[in-house]
Design a protein with these regions (language model features):
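Phosphate/NTP-binding elements of NTP-utilizing enzymes
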Residues: 2-183
């Protein structure tokens, strides 16, 4: 009785019969593609607005593009925008983009009340998750995905190990719940 391996050896399609020159060309071609992919990721990291348009397929207005790029390039961003501008939506999209582009990152949403802190997570779960590009990045395999725990905090977990978590600052900053999770 002939096994699959012996049939492959007989037919000449076994790994032992691959031309070394072909392997060298394949390896160099793969390395070139990997370098292009790394360059693209670094470009997207410094041009967050382009990533949001190219990968997440959201159309941003010009002012939103400027804000998204500032969020991608600065450690601190202060926004003073009018009512109805879409601040929460824009920050949710930017937080998701940062979580995808920087695997293993922990993004904290800190607010005075639990309702305000969970608002951004709710925006991600209810409005952004129907987007197939974002849903593909959410980690459902561990059962985490998105959840709200008993203290009113909520979180979204990504396949790259990133997470977006909400924290309640409280009055005067004395009762930050779960501050040890930020480390």
């Amino acid at each position: 009785m002939e096994t699959d391996k012996s049939a492959a050896l007989r037919s000449g399609y076994a790994p032992e019969s691959i031309d070394p020159a072909f392997l060298d060309a394949l390896t160099s071609d793969l390395a070139a593609h990997l370098n292009v992919a790394v360059e693209q990721i670094w470009y997207w990291r410094s041009h967050l607005d382009v990533f949001i348009g190219d990968y997440l397929h959201f159309k941003l207005f010009d002012t939103q593009q400027v804000i998204a790029r500032a969020i991608g390039n600065c450690s601190d961003v202060a926004l003073a925008l009018c009512r109805g501008y879409g601040k929460t939506w824009l920050l949710a999209v930017c937080a998701v983009a940062l979580a995808i582009l920087w695997p293993g990152s922990r993004i904290a949403v800190v607010s005075k009340t639990a309702g305000q802190a969970n608002l951004l997570i709710d925006k991600i779960v209810n409005e952004l998750l129907p987007n197939a590009d974002i849903e593909r990045e959410i980690d459902y395999s561990t059962g985490k995905g998105s959840k709200v725990n008993m203290s009113g905090r909520s979180a979204v977990y990504f396949k790259g190990g990133s997470s977006i978590r909400s924290y309640v600052l409280g009055f005067g900053g004395d009762n930050v719940l779960g501050i040890r999770d930020l480390r």
